[in-house]
Regions:
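Glycine-rich, N-terminal phosphate-binding loop and its surrounding beta-alpha-beta segment
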Residues: 44-104, 108
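A short glycine/serine-rich beta->alpha loop
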Residues: 11-14, 119-130, 217-221, 276-281, ...
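Alpha-helical support elements that line or immediately flank enzyme active sites
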Residues: 21-33, 128-150, 225, 229-233, ...
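N-terminal, positively charged regions that mediate nucleic acid binding
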Residues: 1-59
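Glycine-rich, mobile lid/loop segments that gate access to catalytic sites or pores
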Residues: 113-223
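Internal helix-turn-beta structural module
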Residues: 11, 302-367
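Glycine-rich anion/phosphate-binding loop at the beta-strand->alpha-helix junction
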Residues: 15-21, 201-204, 208-316
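Short acidic, glycine/tyrosine-flanked loop/strand segments centered on an H-E-D-like triad
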Residues: 99-124, 307-327
Length: 367
């Protein structure tokens, strides 16, 4: 199976299955000398691990990370950083029944058709647990970028019909609730909505939003390495994501050139923008403004409500999916979205180091 690697210089390869022995990641291109320990990674993994609220899967996993290589005496060595998280709470028998049919909204049918064989236990590589490796790699990227003043603020913007009110926006509220919403009123309304979903044996989707600040001008390369194009690829590669937009996104299609253009102004002796409809990118490069994007996440496809499908013999059947599943995955996806964004920015930053001859010359003059 191809397609398990992402990035050019800061390159991430994930491996493992939901019900295998473990899941992990190899991160190549990490600069030497970055202070790094398992706790730096664990903080991020704790944000996505299951069983933290009634709105997430009851599967209990510590998701404790082990760094296997690439770190010595608390610092990265410049060699590949390899990490693993061992699975400890698999209940594969919960999935034995689904080996004979195709779950609506899942990759079962496509895996069977493409490979002629699939790991039906929790979805194998198409499981949400695959994102463990992404989050571990993203933690390294965030640590690296934070030292350069680049910060990430990622949160749940909406759940089902409930959207945060910008007037009530409070960044401190994000980590005070299990839904990762920056609006206390929206948390209450979203919780009530999710309770109704649970009662009806159903699930919900939502939207994650990410704001990246401290970016220099010029990250990203025309034409096929545009920063917004690479972010779209990174975010859309997350299994549950069905939509991506940056800045005003699809609303830009309703605007006029005059209302959509961001006027340039001088501010503190530097070129700046009066507005940020573009979401922090121009011509596929960062423009120094906050980079703002959103990811639309579909409802969890594994639901206990009765659904119609077919089995491998081609017979029409009715199913009710058993097992331990999230009624909503948006809150746990927040850190995954942040991780993929950080990986993309880290890769673009390293690629940008060779963009100008004077920077290369200055570097070698210091040697």
């Amino acid at each position: 199976m191809a397609g398990s690697s992402y990035g050019n210089i800061f390159r991430v390869t994930t491996w493992g299955e939901s019900h295998g022995k473990g899941l992990g990641v190899v991160v190549d291109g990490v600069p030497a000398g970055l202070e790094l320990c398992e706790e730096d990674i664990q903080i991020f993994l704790n944000r996505r691990k299951p069983g933290q609220s009634k709105f997430t899967t009851p599967r209990k996993e510590d998701d404790a990370v082990e760094i296997l290589s690439g770190v010595f005496e608390g610092k990265t060595t410049g060699t590949p950083v390899s990490m693993v998280v061992w699975n400890k709470n698999q209940k594969s028998k919960d999935y034995s029944e689904i080996a004979s049919y195709y779950r609506p909204g899942h990759a079962d049918f496509c895996f069977d058709e493409k490979y002629g064989f699939r790991d039906y236990r929790g979805g194998g590589r198409s499981s949400g647990r695959e994102t463990i490796g992404r989050v571990a790699a993203g933690a390294i990227a965030v640590k690296m970028l934070s030292g350069l003043g680049i910060k990430f603020l990622t949160y749940t913007r909406s759940i089902g019909p409930v959207t945060i009110n910008e007037v009530n926006f409070d960044a401190h509220e994000i980590y005070n609730n299990s839904l990762y919403m920056p609006d206390a009123d929206a948390v209450l309304k979203a919780s009530e909505y999710l309770e109704e979903c649970l009662k009806s044996l159903n699930s919900s989707g939502g939207v994650c939003e990410c704001v990246i600040t401290g970016l220099p001008v010029g990250l990203g390369d025309p034409v096929f390495e545009k920063i917004d194009a690479n972010l779209a690829k990174a975010i859309m590669s997350i299994g549950a994501v069905k939509g991506f937009e940056i800045g005003d996104g699809f609303d830009a299609a309703k605007a006029t050139g005059l209302t959509n253009n961001d006027a340039f102004i001088m501010r503190a002796a530097a070129v700046s923008k009066e507005t940020n409809h573009s979401g922090g990118t121009l011509g596929g490069m960062t423009d120094g403004s906050p980079l703002i994007f959103r990811a639309a996440i579909k409802p969890t496809p594994s639901i206990a409500a009765t659904q119609h499908t077919v089995n491998k013999s081609g017979e029409d059947i009715e199913i009710s999916i058993k097992g331990r599943h999230d009624p909503i995955i948006v809150p746990r996806a927040v850190v995954v979205v942040e991780a993929m964004a950080a990986i993309t920015i880290a890769d673009a930053l390293l690629m940008n180091m060779g963009a100008r001859m004077d920077r290369i010359t200055d570097f070698y003059k210091k040697l």
